[in-house]
């Protein structure tokens, strides 16, 4: 496990870009952290690092935002998903099978289902208005 401290949104995005270079195709990233912690900002960096050019936004209402690029990213918000059937209907496993990088916010809601996929775990804690403590397990950045 590695811990990083970022002092701005830009530094959080940069860490996401750096992680993107380390990810194998079909990687699953399981995010935890409170509202406004910076999960979507981190995913913005992931998307940039994967070569996706569309603007990144929170998938809260859409459940999943898919970003095309040389290495595609499927960005899920699992907060409102309540069953495994809902997870499957949203295309979660299809994206993994296609080799997309899958970033799942609120992954703690499905920890048991995600465990067989051997996810990379990222927790983001809000220290203050600009500072974040980011812990990453499962890959070195």
Per-segment meaning from a language model:
Residues 39:
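Conserved lysine of the Walker
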